[in-house]
Every structure is written in C-alpha cells, then in structure tokens.
Amino acid sequence: MRTYLDLLQHVLDHGVDRDDRTGTGTRSVFGYQMRFDLEEGFPVLTTKKLHLRSIIHELLWFLKGDTNIAYLKENGVTIWDEWADENGDLGPVYGYQWRSWPAPDGRHIDQIANLLKMLHTNPQSRSLIVSAWNPALVDEMALPPCHCLFQFYVANGRLSCQLYQRSADIFLGVPFNIASYALLTMMIAQVTGLKPGEFIHTLGDAHIYSNHFEQARLQLTRTPKKLPVMHINPDVKDLFAFRFEDFRLDGYEADPTIKAPIAV
C-alpha cells in the first residue's frame, strides 16, 4: 500500500523528535489522514507480512465485549500480553466500552448494537458513532484507547467508516488498525445489506518510535504488491455470530516480517 509508505516517509522527513510516555522517544507529526477504497482490495500491508490471525481474533474479541486476554491466548494471540495483570485482565478497555458503556443511571449501553439498529432504521444519521474514550474510566484501563472513536456514513448503498486514532504507532500498530477497521466495516456492511465503501484513517499524534527508524527505512525500500481479496462467509447475518473460520484472505503475497520492539 503506497498510502502507508507515504505516511512512513512523511513522518521520517517532516516529523518532530519528542519524548514520550514509554521513554523510548518518537518522531511524530500531528494530524494525518489516509483513505482506502475497500472495493480495490483488502488494505493489508504487502511490504511486510502481517499476522492476520491476530487481527481477526482481536476484532472478534472486541465485539464480544471481552477485556480478559484468555480468549486471545487460547487462539495464539499475544499482542495484549504486556499490558494484562496477573489474572489476564485489562480493565474497562475497548470491548467493555463498545458493548457495555456505563451510564450514570446504572444502565449499560451497547454502542455496537445501537449502531446496527440505527444503520437499519436511520442510515442517513450523522450520529453513527462508537466511542472507546470514556474519561471517567481511562485511569482504570491498562492502556488508554489509541483508536478511540469511529463514525459510519452511508451513501449510494455503500458503508464507509472514519476512525480517529489519538495515538498512532505507525510501524507496529497502524497496519493492524487499518486491517482491523477495514474488516469491521466489511462485516457491518454485510449484516446491514450494504456494500463496503471507504475506510478513512485519521491520525492525531502519528509517530515512529526511535528504535523503529531502521526498520521503517528498510520497509521503504520494498515495492507494494497487489492487494489481496477478503472473503467473508455470506451466510453470516449477525455481527456477533462471526467466527475466525468465516474469513479467508486470497492472494496475499507479502515481503518478510520486519521485527521491532514494542514500547510498553
């Protein structure tokens, strides 16, 4: 995906070197946007191989409303291990906010279920929004939500999604986020009778960690390949009924993985 490589190059060339929470140091820009037309192929990096299994299982885990890493561990996914406590708990992170946002009156709001209902009953609404940023609970989360708010838009029978990501780890995190929200858009489009439109990715603090510079420059020497095609089981009409086996990525050819340390 040339769009992603352009982001890497832009931050390396124009970013500002700054300190950060982890003590690693970053080079960052503030405010950047990428657009991906989902009819042109599934937006997964081809200039380094991604672990698709982790991306799919993490998304299914979010949609379950789960906040314990047991499900992830059972399925060979380790991307949340560094932040979990001794019991595997992460606090009220993404899944909890998506599916069980606590209201002042004691109710719990299922934002995803509400979104699906609105897409069926009022697809022209400008309130097709899900937020993971709950100021009252941020301090109880193992990690404040990086991809914190997303909005859907329906036009000409196509469903588009825009994600606002306050903190974007460009080398390790952003490729996962692109694929995850593109897949979520495709899944929701299927269960609401729409076609996938665009995924728009808006970044706040878009940064490359200083110990990822060498890896980023290596990736920039590689040439993007044709995007693969994601096939989703057409028989699934309930968003919460999807399983890992319902997804198949065809034609995914990618350069070797580039290893880089995680900043915790």
Curated annotation (Swiss-Prot):
Reactions listed under catalytic activity: dUMP + (6R)-5,10-methylene-5,6,7,8-tetrahydrofolate = 7,8-dihydrofolate + dTMP
E.C. number: 2.1.1.45
Domain of life: Bacteria
Annotated (6R)-5,10-methylene-5,6,7,8-tetrahydrofolate binding sites: H51, D169, A263
GO biological process per UniProt: dTMP biosynthetic process; dTTP biosynthetic process; methylation
GO cellular component: cytosol
Catalytic residues as annotated in Swiss-Prot or TrEMBL: C146
One protein family per Pfam: Thymidylat_synt
Single GO term (MF): thymidylate synthase activity
Binding positions (dUMP): R21, R166, S167, A168, D169, N177, H207, I208, Y209
Keywords carried by this UniProt record: Cytoplasm, Methyltransferase, Nucleotide biosynthesis, Transferase
Localization, UniProt: Cytoplasm
Enzyme class name: transferase
Pathway field: Pyrimidine metabolism; dTTP biosynthesis
Biological role: Catalyzes the reductive methylation of 2'-deoxyuridine-5'-monophosphate (dUMP) to 2'-deoxythymidine-5'-monophosphate (dTMP) while utilizing 5,10-methylenetetrahydrofolate (mTHF) as the methyl donor and reductant in the reaction, yielding dihydrofolate (DHF) as a by-product. This enzymatic reaction provides an intracellular de novo source of dTMP, an essential precursor for DNA biosynthesis.
Subunit architecture: Homodimer.
Membership in a protein family: Belongs to the thymidylate synthase family. Bacterial-type ThyA subfamily.
PANTHER family: THYMIDYLATE SYNTHASE (PTHR11548:SF9), THYMIDYLATE SYNTHASE 1 (PTHR11548)
NCBIfam families: PRK01827.1-3, PRK01827.1-5, thym_sym
Name by which UniProt lists this protein: Thymidylate synthase
UniProt organism field: Brucella canis (strain ATCC 23365 / NCTC 10854 / RM-666)
Protein's gene: thyA
